[in-house]
Amino acid sequence: MTGDRSDEAREAYGRLVARRERVQAGEVPWSALCDEFFTDDVVFIDPAWGRNEGRAAVADFMDRSMVGLEDWTFPEEWTMVDGDRVVSFWWNRLPGTRPDGRPYQAPGISILHYAGDGRFSYECDLLNMAEVFEVMKDSGWAPAGPVGIPPKRPDRDITPPR
């Protein structure tokens, strides 16, 4: 499906990315994404933190999960939109560069469902956590202070809401 809904979804996602850049700059908290861009019944799946349901739970997860990662960025590489479906390739980028000048980074993919009115009802982030830890080790990165700790047994059900 293409047309108005794809354009609307792409525009909403572009606004979400712009707001995320403000978050990364320290201007607003991660939870600020929830009020504007997610539905009340949103489902958000993170590979380390698992499934989070409802805007309030997702806002709490976002703030807790990003503690200690304030110097990381998450630049977009590309985004595809097909109707209500948005797929984005992005980077988990740590501070610094490798000796050859490349950034320390690991890829990530997000799958989102656009619900209309500028909001998303589903996001599933996919990344290789082993690779993220390898990049952390290679870079010598360590958090400046406390870091958010994921649950020991998160719900990893990626089923979208019906």
Identify the meaning behind each predicted range:
Residues T2-E8, M66-R162:
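A beta-strand edge to alpha-helix "cap/lid" segment located at domain peripheries
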Residues V17, V43-N52, P150-P160:
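Short N-terminal signal/transit or membrane-insertion segments
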Residues L16-V28, N52, D71-E76, G96-T97:
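Phosphate-binding glycine-rich loops and adjacent basic patches that engage nucleotide phosphates
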Residues W30-G83:
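A solvent-exposed, acidic/Ser-Thr-rich amphipathic alpha-helical stretch
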Residues Y13-R20, F38, V58, M62-S65, ...:
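Hydrophobic alpha-helical core bundles mediating ligand binding, dimerization, or RNAP-core interactions
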Residues T2-D40:
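Short acidic-aromatic low-complexity motifs
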